[in-house]
Amino acid sequence: VCSSDLASTARNMSPRLLGVMERAKNPSYRFNSLAHLIDEGALERAFRRLDGRSAEGGDGVTKAHYGEALGERLAELHTKLREGRWRHQPILRVNIPKGRGKTRPIGISCVEDKLVQGSLAELLGAVYEPMFRPCSFGFRPGRGAHDALRALNDVLFREPVAYILEIDIESFFDSIDRTKLQEMLWERVADKSLRRLVGKCLHVGVLEGVSVSYSASGTTQGSSLSPLLGNVYLHHVLDTWYEDEVAPRLRGRTRLFRYADDAVITFESEARS
């Protein structure tokens, strides 16, 4: 990752998370103690980031209602996390229109679970952001769709490009191999308490109507943790694989641009693609 992206990320981080990010710059460093960083301060930051207009989860509690006794609720949640008593409630599944008569299922967590997801995403982001490649633009601090388009446009006008391959991974978040994802995560995270917490967020039931179902794969769309987990997964199976193993074997220039589960690869000629 380039230094300007890390600087953008660091501007909104607590001093302790900055320390995590600094250690994470060493690719061989493994974190043995991270869970204690999900404290009341981290939970409150996650609360402040919540959109107050978002729908409530299965428990019917809104952000405004949860915030009426915020200090007490955060202290209680932190105690449950510290003692290992926190359990992720089933995620409410709703289907939203996608166009052409199709729908896309998303999951809505209760406020308390959103705070845990948000705190985990903030902490794991400090661990993995230094590792991510410049080709990745989705759901990263200081980067977005316009940055991806600008970078692609620069290559199209400044480099010899004769062929473009567009990739859209169908049902990506629903099809992620959880076992492989956790193996990727544990390469950097040795903290068993944090591992258990991530596991609780992955292996969670889905509430549809009055029934709760469980799946063996995927991460829930709508969870604030899912974009980061998706980036970790695709960093390994696409970004690193293509740039380190595939691109060096090709003749001519090739570039990868990825925004979440959508990607574009440019080639100097169709024959070399």
What is each model feature region?
Residues 1-3:
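Short, small-residue-biased leader/transition segments that mark boundaries at the very start
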Residues 5-6, 271:
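Acidic, proline/serine/threonine- and glycine-rich low-complexity intrinsically disordered segments
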Residues 7-64, 122-135:
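Charged boundary/loop elements
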Residues 44-53, 58-103:
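Phosphate/adenylate-binding "loop-and-lid" substructures adjacent to NTP/NAD/dNTP-binding pockets
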Residues 46-50, 119, 197-202:
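Short alpha-helical scaffolding segments that buttress acidic/His motifs in well-ordered protein cores
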Residues 73, 80-95, 99, 131-273:
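Conserved polymerase palm-domain catalytic core
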Residues 105-110:
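Conserved phosphate-binding loops in nucleotide/dinucleotide-binding enzymes
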Residues 111-112, 116-121, 145, 163:
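Duplex nucleic acid-engaging cores and interfaces of nucleic-acid transaction enzymes
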